[in-house]
Amino acid sequence: MVVIRLARGGSKKRPFYNLVATDSRNRRDGRFVERVGFYNPVGSEGSENLRIALDRVKYWVDNGAQLSPAVERLVKEHSAKVSAAA
């Protein structure tokens, strides 16, 4: 089953996450099918902390992918921000 989840990167005490579509049996930071965004929880105030390709997330969900709880929260937050800006 394909799942969209966070893959951790960055260094110690400075996390950086990629939102990836991957097989659920793969390791958290292992092989993935497609990178659909990123999340930087400790980014500076002026930088972009969250970017999600909502069209690609919709594509994967329409084809049976499931979102992890953290990714589901981030997608809701990002889509609300995008709709408010438009």
UniProtKB/Swiss-Prot annotation:
Q: Any stretches that span the bilayer, and where are they?
A: none
Q: Which GO terms describe its cellular component?
A: cytoplasm; small ribosomal subunit
The record's section on Pfam families has: Ribosomal_S16 (PF00886)
Recall the GO molecular function terms of this protein's record: structural constituent of ribosome
Keywords assigned by UniProt? Ribonucleoprotein, Ribosomal protein
Keyword Ribonucleoprotein applies: yes
Biological process, per Gene Ontology: translation
Q: Does the keyword Ribonucleoprotein apply?
A: yes
Matches recorded under HAMAP family = Ribosomal_bS16 (MF_00385)
Q: Which NCBIfam families match?
A: S16 (TIGR00002)
Family designation: Belongs to the bacterial ribosomal protein bS16 family.
Q: What is this protein called?
A: Small ribosomal subunit protein bS16
